[in-house]
UniProtKB/Swiss-Prot annotation:
This is Riboflavin biosynthesis protein RibBA. Residues 1-204 are annotated as: DHBP synthase. It comes from Mycolicibacterium vanbaalenii (strain DSM 7251 / JCM 13017 / BCRC 16820 / KCTC 9966 / NRRL B-24157 / PYR-1) (Mycobacterium vanbaalenii). Keywords: GTP-binding, Hydrolase, Lyase, Magnesium, Manganese, Metal-binding, Multifunctional enzyme, Nucleotide-binding, Riboflavin biosynthesis, Zinc. The gene is ribBA. The keyword Coiled coil does not apply.
Amino acid sequence: MTRLDSVERAVADIAAGKAVVVIDDEDRENEGDLIFAAEKATPELVAFMVRYTSGYLCVPLAGDICDRLGLLPMYAVNQDKHGTAYTVTVDAKKGVGTGISAMDRATTMRLLADPDAVADDFTKPGHVVPLRAKDGGVLRRPGHTEAAVDLARLAGLQPAGAICEIVSQKDEGAMAQTDELRIFADEHDLALISIADLIEWRRKHEKHIARVAEARIPTRHGEFRAVGYTSIYEDVEHVALVKGEISGPHSDGHDVLVRVHSECLTGDVFGSRRCDCGPQLDAALAMVAREGRGVVLYMRGHEGRGIGLMHKLQAYQLQDAGDDTVDANLKLGLPADARDYGTGAQILVDLGVRSMRLLTNNPAKRVGLDGYGLHIIERVPLPVRANAENIRYLMTKRDRMGHDLVGLEDFDEAVPGELGGAV
């Protein structure tokens, strides 16, 4: 596995006017870009970039900068397979020659990052390619465009970067891959980070949820307080069902019974027996109600362990043909578990949870939440509800995904009822 540097080092280097190397997912472009802050552009930096990259130099910009400078899309209907938002090319109107030299392009880059620049300061077309970054950065789109803008912003600079793909020194007709990028970064004393690490860093260090509403929800397990949240950078809504006082005059937020439940339309709503999601949700509500204090956090966007409803149905189709739940996902080119718990962790912190007893049979969920500063003092198992339709699925979760599901070996399809009984 390729050694990566810290996001903190990359941000510090960007602030100091150095370049960094950023790699994306191997299932996406699988390339590394040389990135520096546009306002720090120098002829030397641009010349270095031209020497070791494809030479197609781009300047990612925050959307409001593109609007202020009148940078319209290069083509009305974006057909780029990765959704890169190219705008019309530009040169600085003053202080440049033909616009193509390292000195000229550095001038244009700095001007694009100048907060006082206006549309009339540029000629179009030109030799620098501005790119429009998605609002929300890598949390909305895991691309180099957004990574460059995020790094500049985190460095305290204008949200404008300079990027270009690094070419292979072994095969000049190809782009450099991860191992070669590590060697390149070491040779030139550059930080090497991944977009995945930048996403994780932002999820840990920035608040990206908003509390929207609270209402009383009477259920068959008693009354809960429903607290609604939105993810600021994603079109996803979540709801926490809260029982009792989590933190306040009479509670310190510690030792809270918590269930983080992933949305499952088929199991939670339709009562599908292919999974145990519906019974787990019901059991969690009952256990929190009996406790008199706790949270059941319902995470939207986690359907099918994060792959979405349609992909889940496609995975079911493969399972009907003989694949297990893990292999079905992999055959679709999807991870066995794509869930991220950063949003859930922020919601729990906002509710006042400081330490908790986590209701789950999935040890990975504990790791996913623990990484965000929440102290998990105990993992409380949920009852196992096996039936003839889900027994193979549950055994796969136990044997291949490490879920702690005790008693599955006692399941007997010939015996009526479900293993686990009523809660």
